[in-house]
């Protein structure tokens, strides 16, 4: 059996998680983008970093360019192992498709080349925006992916101790979001070669574990408990046999609660008594009387004919 969601978060906007430490506001995507969000990260108590989600693991997108803009505070943007600290005055940071990257909320001060107001920035909330281009593919970084990835990580950390790796790969596969192969190449290998090799291997590891192995074991990238636009999520998963086999669509035939309440009953107690309204279990006389009355009525009907 695959992963089973616990949290019900479909339709929530903003999406509030980790006891209010993170808010994700889904905004109307600008033309040509697959999504746009504004996230608010509340400051953590000193030393309270464990268990709080403060940024994704290193990853890459094959078909989408991602953009970041800080509204308040500062955020570290790591691209191919190089970290840049982004502030409101710095405008938009762009990460082209194919690059290994992540954003870092609690960025290490050693990466900051412009350290003014460090203490004030560290103590305040962080607000920043993210969007990505729309590649037109079935599996893209969009609201459906974000709702499910955020749902998986909350259920994993709140009700467990770690994220199911197969589920992580399946969800990442559904969002053009792949885990790079570990950086094990010698330092003399050019960065461009290293990125190309790590992304090639990382893509296939993510797809093989998430889609092929996970799909056969009952995993899927998206779950109804997390997903606002479930019909689109189903359409995405039906594009590959490995996920399609785990998706069922009987819910489309369901009658709404309003219609159920307004339905006229098509049966009554008489149906349970086979039309003998006066019949009582164990009351033979009443049954005989009901049968005789019915026979008499049938006789009258024949005379009338």
Curated annotation (Swiss-Prot):
SUPFAM superfamilies: RmlC-like cupins. It comes from Beauveria bassiana (strain ARSEF 2860). Keywords: Oxidoreductase, Virulence. This is Oxidoreductase OpS7. The keyword ATP-binding does not apply. It is an enzyme of class 1 (oxidoreductase). The gene is OpS7. Oxidoreductase; part of the gene cluster that mediates the biosynthesis of the bibenzoquinone oosporein, a metabolite required for fungal virulence that acts by evading host immunity to facilitate fungal multiplication in insects. The non-reducing polyketide synthase OpS1 produces orsellinic acid by condensing acetyl-CoA with 3 malonyl-CoA units. Orsellinic acid is then hydroxylated to benzenetriol by the hydroxylase OpS4. The intermediate is oxidized either nonenzymatically to 5,5'-dideoxy-oosporein or enzymatically to benzenetetrol by the oxidoreductase OpS7. InterPro entries: RmlC-like_jellyroll (IPR014710), RmlC_Cupin_sf (IPR011051). Gene3D superfamilies: Jelly Rolls (2.60.120.10). It comes from the Eukaryota. Belongs to the oxidoreductase OpS7 family. The keyword Ubl conjugation does not apply. Disruption phenotype: Impairs the conversion of 5,5'-dideoxy-oosporein into oosporein. GO terms for molecular function: oxidoreductase activity. Induction: Expression is positively regulated by the oosporein cluster specific regulator OpS3 that binds the promoter at a 5'-CGGA-3' motif. Expression is negatively regulated by the global transcription factor Msn2 that binds the stress-response element 5'-AGGGG-3'. Pathway: Secondary metabolite biosynthesis.
């Amino acid at each position: 059996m695959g992963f089973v969601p616990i949290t019900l978060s479909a339709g929530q906007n903003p999406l509030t998680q980790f006891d209010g430490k993170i808010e994700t506001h889904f905004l109307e995507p600008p033309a040509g983008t697959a999504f746009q969000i504004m996230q608010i990260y509340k400051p953590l108590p000193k030393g309270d970093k464990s268990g709080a989600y403060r940024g994704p693991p290193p990853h890459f997108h094959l078909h989408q360019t991602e953009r970041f803009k800080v509204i308040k505070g500062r955020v570290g943007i790591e691209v191919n192992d190089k970290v840049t600290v982004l502030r409101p005055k710095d405008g938009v940071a762009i990460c082209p498709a194919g690059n290994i990257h992540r954003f870092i909320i609690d960025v290490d001060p050693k990466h900051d080349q412009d350290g003014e107001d460090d203490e004030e920035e560290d103590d305040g909330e962080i607000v920043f925006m993210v969007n990505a281009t729309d590649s037109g593919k079935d599996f893209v970084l969009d609201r459906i992916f974000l709702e499910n990835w955020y749902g998986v990580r909350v259920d994993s950390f709140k009700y467990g101790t770690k994220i199911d790796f197969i589920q992580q790969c399946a969800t990442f596969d559904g969002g053009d979001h792949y885990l790079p192969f570990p950086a094990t190449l010698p330092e003399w290998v050019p960065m461009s070669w290293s990125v190309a090799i790590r992304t090639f291997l990382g893509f296939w590891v993510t797809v093989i574990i998430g889609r092929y192995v996970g799909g056969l074991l009952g995993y899927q990238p998206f779950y109804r408990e997390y997903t606002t636009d479930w019909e689109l999520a189903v359409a995405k998963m039906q594009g590959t046999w490995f996920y399609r086999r785990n998706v069922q669509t009987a819910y489309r035939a369901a009658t709404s609660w309003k219609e159920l309440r307004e339905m006229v009953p098509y049966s009554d107690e008489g149906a349970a008594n086979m039309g003998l309204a006066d019949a009582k279990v164990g009351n033979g006389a009443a049954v005989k009387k009901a049968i005789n009355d019915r026979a008499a009525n049938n006789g009258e009907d024949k005379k009338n004919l």
